[in-house]
């Protein structure tokens, strides 16, 4: 049952991330809009994870589905890394540095803030 909980949560999180990328996609700025979608997904997943870790749910399978499944499927380190490399390859070093810095700072901040708010 744990496997099913993670699989369903992961499928839902992945579909959320894909939907967000479709919602924000623009043909005239594909890397910019893809990076924005990844940033939003990672920050939102970090916030959800922070809140869930501060107040674990009584149902361990639901907790597993949300933490490992949804947060894991919604966030993406691999896409974030690939997009940062693409910014460098286009010669946009400052955008790459800004993207990496914003992604890390906002994700850590969102997770810490959500944890603090939920832990009260």
Predicted segments, located by residue:
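Membrane-interface helix-loop junctions in multi-pass transporters/channels
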Residues: 1-120
